[in-house]
Amino acid sequence: NQRFKKLCRLPQLGVYVDEAHHLFGADLEKQIRSSGANKTSLRDTINLLAANTSIVACYNYTGTPYVKNQLLPEVVYAYGLRESIWNGYLKDADPIGFENVKSDEFLNATVTKFWQKYGGRIYDNLNPKLAIYAANVEEAVNEVVPALEEILTRLEIPTTSILLNVGDSKYTKDEDIRNFNNLDVPGSEGNEKQFVVLVEKGKEGWNCRSLFGVALYRSPKSKIFVLQATMRCLRAITDERLTATVFLSKEN
């Protein structure tokens, strides 16, 4: 295409790839070790650029260098969560384990502790938020939200602070999507949504600085999901050293 042709005219080219694990298909072994394997379009594009230009560097970045729990063999430098927290690039993390996370007791303990730690506080003109991950839409709608409404009522917190984002237009409307995208916008309606119930949302790539807590109302087998979901609350928001809280099963 025209863009590719213009890129090929550049005398020197640097390639930067974000979320680089998407360079590989689902079958990592075939993608990397089998010479006859199909290549992904992005890898093909980079290889074509290399053949037609003078690529001086190709940098690939990812927060999850795995495909189906297999570590990518091309990792040359890693800067881990621990180092990022120690050096002040991320919030610190306070994980709290529970025996049974599929219960009203878990939600009650989670919301109560979250509100005790962060309720009424403001960070960079933003209200602190708690994300609650359910396993499926029915569970989010029929179990999590009703229990959450009861808990908030008891704590004298407006139930209008609940936001449901489950990827189903029957329950999540355009206004909800707009509020979800505005969680980090001071003065917006989205900023008033402090309890965000999610299904298959808010994982990889979700950047919400005002997120101070994550609760897994499930015990997923995937370590990658646990990592991607729980680390969402670690984004730094001020120069102050802050701590986010993670509520999950002891197994996770």
Give the predicted meaning of each segment.
Residues 31, 102, 106-204, 220:
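Conserved C-terminal RecA-like helicase domain
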Residues 50-55, 81-89, 93-102, 107-108, ...:
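Extended charged low-complexity segments that act as oligomerization/scaffolding linkers
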Residues 1-16, 24-48, 178-186, 198-200:
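Conserved RecA-like ASCE ATPase "motif II neighborhood" in helicase/translocase motors
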Residues 25-93:
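Post-DEXD/H (motif II) to motif III coupling segment of the RecA-like Helicase ATP-binding lobe
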Residues 228, 232-252:
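Conserved segment of the helicase C-terminal RecA-like domain
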Residues 195-211, 229-233:
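SF2 helicase motor core recognition
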Residues 11-14, 53-59, 191-195:
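Loop/turn-to-beta-strand initiation segments
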